[in-house]
Amino acid sequence: MFPLKKSLLLLFFLATINLSLCEQERNAEEERRDEPDERNAEVEKRFFPIVGKLLSGLLGK
């Protein structure tokens, strides 16, 4: 019974640390995206390739 409790406790702590690290990384990414110019650049990077693919599909190229 003791080894099972010990391994479950270890698993719990490792999962907690992992979630904490993920949350810190997500917060850092959100801070980087706070500037509107960077947000607009990201939208443009995602938008133009999609439009290009749609237009090339419609034009038959």
UniProtKB/Swiss-Prot annotation:
The protein, known as: Temporin-ALi
GO cellular component, one term: extracellular region
Gene Ontology biological process terms in this record: defense response to bacterium; defense response to fungus; innate immune response; killing of cells of another organism
Function of the molecule: Antimicrobial peptide with activity against Gram-positive and Gram-negative bacteria and against fungi. Has been tested against S.aureus (MIC=7.5 ug/mL), B.pumilus (MIC=7.5 ug/mL), B.cereus (MIC=75.0 ug/mL), E.coli (MIC=7.5 ug/mL), B.dysenteriae (MIC=20.0 ug/mL), A.cacoaceticus (MIC=60.0 ug/mL), P.aeruginosa (MIC=5.0 ug/mL) and C.albicans (MIC=5.0 ug/mL). Also shows a weak hemolytic activity.
Major location category of this protein: secreted
Source organism of the structure: Amolops loloensis (Lolokou Sucker Frog)
Pfam families xrefs: FSAP_sig_propep
Secretion signal span: 1-22
Entries under InterPro entries matching the protein: Frog_antimicrobial_propeptide
Keywords: Amidation, Amphibian defense peptide, Antibiotic, Antimicrobial, Cleavage on pair of basic residues, Fungicide, Immunity, Innate immunity, Secreted, Signal
Signal found in the keyword field: yes
Similarity annotation: Belongs to the frog skin active peptide (FSAP) family. Temporin subfamily.
Propeptide, residue positions: 23-46
Superkingdom of origin: Eukaryota
Known tissue expression: Expressed by the skin glands.
Keyword Magnesium: no
Residues with PTM Leucine amide: L59
Compartments, as annotated in UniProt: Secreted
